[in-house]
């Protein structure tokens, strides 16, 4: 079936003017995830912030209770014993100057990047490469740390980084269509709680204004904001 026809069929029964309770919205999205691959379930939170102002930036990391259903490749910048710890914890790529050279050459074989604090002067050279990809290590979200083993295990185990975009939206994958409705709801609530805890001091008025759930190839379903906590 052509994508256009599939999407048109999937939109049937979805009232685009209605706000659905979270559990009902998740059920509808799962029922409409009919692609041959296991679609990712995504959440978009429209926040009452303007990220152009430093005191309204929202970012953080959350450990989803049921994982993401996706296996992340993790790269670690570390030396010596910390490099050994990273490897033992399951990091896919570990290095120092050699890894910096690889990344500078466009060879990025990881999805999440972690670094020990002493490596940051070196990793800082990669800002133009890693920054636009949202992969620059940052102590605020636990990716610049001496506990490289914990960070690697977290990334592999279902931790999700989130950051508000220019339009004031936080988007994140919260699982797969093959997950049960209950597991998806738990993951979405964990994300919403983490975003709420990350509320910046400069945020005024209603913080979480609009919520939508969708699958990779399916329509968005609007959610009652009050049902996500």
Swiss-Prot record:
A GO BP entry: regulation of translation
A Pfam match: Ribosomal_L1
Molecular functions (GO terms): rRNA binding; structural constituent of ribosome; tRNA binding
Keywords annotated in UniProt: Repressor, Ribonucleoprotein, Ribosomal protein, RNA-binding, rRNA-binding, Translation regulation, tRNA-binding
GO CC list: cytosolic large ribosomal subunit
Keyword Cytoplasm set for record: no
Keyword Zinc-finger: no
Coiled coil: none
Gene3D superfamilies: 3.30.190.20, 3.40.50.790
Free-text function comment from the UniProt entry: Binds directly to 23S rRNA. The L1 stalk is quite mobile in the ribosome, and is involved in E site tRNA release. Protein L1 is also a translational repressor protein, it controls the translation of the L11 operon by binding to its mRNA.
Family listed: Belongs to the universal ribosomal protein uL1 family.
Subunit organization: Part of the 50S ribosomal subunit.
Stated name of the protein: Large ribosomal subunit protein uL1
Lineage: Bacteria, Pseudomonadati, Pseudomonadota, Alphaproteobacteria, Hyphomicrobiales
Gene of this entry: rplA
């Amino acid at each position: 079936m052509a994508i256009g026809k599939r999407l048109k069929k999937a939109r049937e029964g979805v009232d685009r003017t209605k706000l659905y309770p979270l559990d009902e919205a998740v059920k509808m999205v799962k029922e409409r995830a009919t692609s041959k691959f296991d679609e990712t379930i995504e959440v978009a939170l429209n926040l009452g912030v303007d990220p152009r102002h430093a005191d309204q930036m929202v970012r953080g990391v959350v450990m989803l209770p049921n994982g993401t259903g996706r296996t992340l490749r993790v790269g670690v910048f570390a030396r010596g014993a910390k490099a050994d710890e990273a490897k033992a914890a399951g990091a896919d790529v570990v290095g120092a100057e050699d890894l910096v050279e690889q990344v500078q050459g466009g060879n990025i074989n990881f999805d999440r990047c972690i670094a020990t604090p002493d490596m940051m002067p070196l990793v800082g050279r990669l800002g133009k490469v890693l920054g636009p990809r949202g992969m620059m290590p940052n102590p605020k979200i636990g990716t610049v740390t001496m506990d490289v083993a914990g960070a690697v295990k977290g990334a592999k185990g279902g931790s999700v980084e989130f950051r508000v975009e220019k339009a004031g939206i936080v988007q994140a994958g919260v699982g797969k269509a093959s997950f049960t409705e209950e597991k998806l709801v738990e993951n979405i609530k964990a994300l919403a709680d983490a975003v709420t805890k990350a509320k910046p001091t400069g945020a005024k008025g209603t913080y979480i204004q609009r919520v939508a759930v969708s699958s990779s190839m399916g329509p968005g379903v609007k959610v009652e904001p009050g049902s996500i906590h």
